Amino acid sequence: MSEANDSKVNLDVPEHLEYSDEHVWVDSSVEPAMVGVTEYATEQFGELVYIDLPEVGTQVETGDEVAEFESSKAVTALVSPVAGTIRYVNNEAADDPSIVTDDPYGEGWIFKIELEDDEPDLLSADEYAKIVAD
């Protein structure tokens, strides 16, 4: 596991995932692929109070805003790093947004998507760790 070193916090960056520079992770080793936000993103959010999830069946393109996170600090859009069709959404995370903060790489996933492209253009764990370390 890579770690992004910050003077205040060490963040987990699991090596088996791929990342966008928008702080979204993708696990394309499972079908449909799983998508969520990184630990770094959850640190930036502060306390999440509401998550607006996409609808199952929605076709998304890379770069589309597909979900919204409302926190004590701001409302932030989740920008999809991949194109495809949303197959599942994590209603448990919508019901209790703290799941995303507490376990962003596990129970806090946001949606599962059937990918259009078998090889999306994403960052490795090491590449992403360098971005958040800067």
Please report, for each region that a protein language model flagged, where it lies by residue:
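Acidic, low-complexity mobile loops and tails
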Residues: 2-65, 98, 102-134
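Small beta-strand-rich domains/subdomains or short beta-sheet motifs embedded
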Residues: 18, 52, 70, 75-80
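Conserved hydrophobic positions within beta-strands
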Residues: 23, 69, 78, 83-86
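Residue-level recognition of beta-strand microenvironments
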Residues: 26-28, 72, 89-92
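A short acidic/small-residue loop/turn micro-motif
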Residues: 41, 74, 94-95
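Charged, amphipathic alpha-helical coiled-coil/dimerization segments
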Residues: 83-88, 95, 101
